[in-house]
Structures are given as C-alpha cells and as structure tokens.
Design a protein with these regions (language model features):
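Phosphate-binding site recognition
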Residues: 1-198
Length: 198
C-alpha cells in the first residue's frame, strides 16, 4: 500500500509529531519513508526512490531539505545495570553515522570532535550548536521512544521508571536537550516520534 500520500498531510499539519499506535501498525516503515524523502543527501535520487509512488508526482516544498538524525530506542538494553551504557552506545552510533554522512555540511573537524565527546547529551548539544551556527535544518526521528522505559516499568516498577523519566533522570534530560534544539531558532525544525500504545 502506497502511504506516501500522507507525507503532504504530515508536512502541512505540524512540525512536531508524536504517533502512538499498536505494534505492527507500520510506524517504522513510514518513518523510513520520511527519512529518505526529506534527506538532503537523497534529494537527487527523488525520481528513482519515489517516481512510481503518489508523492513522485506530488512532491512537497520541503522534499530533500533536511539533515536527518534518527534513533530507534528498541535497541537499548533495559537492564538497569546496562541501560545508561547501552543508551549512550546506541546514540554514539547514530551520531557517528550522522557526522560521517553529513560531514560536508559542517566545518572541518566536526566528525572528529563528535567522536571525542563522551556521552549522548554532549554529542546532542554539540550537534545542535554547530547546526544552529551554520543555519542547518535537522529533521529528528525517534522510533520506539518508549521501548526500554516500558520494559523497565513492566519489570522493575514505577520507582525505577520515574527515576529515568522524571526530575533529573537521564532520559528526561536527553529530551530536555531535544526540546532546546527545537525551540526558537534551534536547528531541529521537524520531529517525528513514535511509540507503542499499551
């Protein structure tokens, strides 16, 4: 089923989407379509990628206009002893790929500096700062944002869950940094986050 007709609706209706649906609903597939559609490095492949689909003959103004930063938190280990390391490892891999893939848009040394930063928060802060300074636009995707937190809630209880997601919890802090990058003249111009409905 061609779901590319929904791209224009997403673009028209809001800059920040939060989609909660049951498993097997097609959320991840739709995110992949959006990633490829908006990626500035794939702009010249539009006809090849989308030519036979609805959006191929109905492109939107923002097609191919963004640096795409994406995360899939399904890959984060929910074991409390491994969680922070696993989260930082996942994010480090995503930031490494982002820095390599979009290196030409940044000043020399961007990738090396990114590699040297010790955790997800610092990598995110650096990315936001550099993109803002260079007037670059980022489309941020997070698939299964609630995957490991739901596992912790189910297996460890509300106390552990709140320690991560409330107050000074590291996951809360990470989302506060995202919010900072998406407000005012921040470089995160669009965001699409998916989760699983209970």
């Amino acid at each position: 089923v061609d779901k590319t007709r929904y791209i224009a609706e997403v673009e028209r209706n809001a800059s920040f989407f939060f989609l909660i649906r049951p498993r097997r609903f097609g959320k991840s597939l739709f995110l992949n379509v959006l990633r490829w559609y908006y990626d500035v490095n794939r702009k010249d492949s539009f006809e090849e990628l989308f030519g036979d689909l609805y959006i191929g003959s109905h492109p939107t103004p923002e097609q191919g206009q963004y640096l795409v930063l994406d995360f899939n938190f399904a890959g984060v280990n929910p074991d409390p002893d491994e969680l922070i390391r696993s989260f930082n490892d996942h994010c480090a891999a995503r930031f490494r790929e982002f820095a390599y893939y979009y290196e030409r848009f940044f000043n020399p040394g961007f990738r090396e500096k990114m590699e040297s930063l010790p955790n997800a928060d610092e990598k995110l802060t650096y990315t936001i700062s550099e993109a803002k300074r260079l007037n670059l636009s980022i489309y941020l995707f997070i698939d299964e944002y609630d995957n490991f937190t739901n596992a912790i809630l189910a297996n460890m209880g509300e106390k552990h869950y709140k320690a991560l997601t409330h107050g000074t919890g590291f996951f809360r802090y990470f989302f506060n940094k995202l919010k900072e990058g998406a407000t005012g003249d921040g470089p995160i111009k669009r965001m699409f986050i998916t989760g699983v409905s209970p």
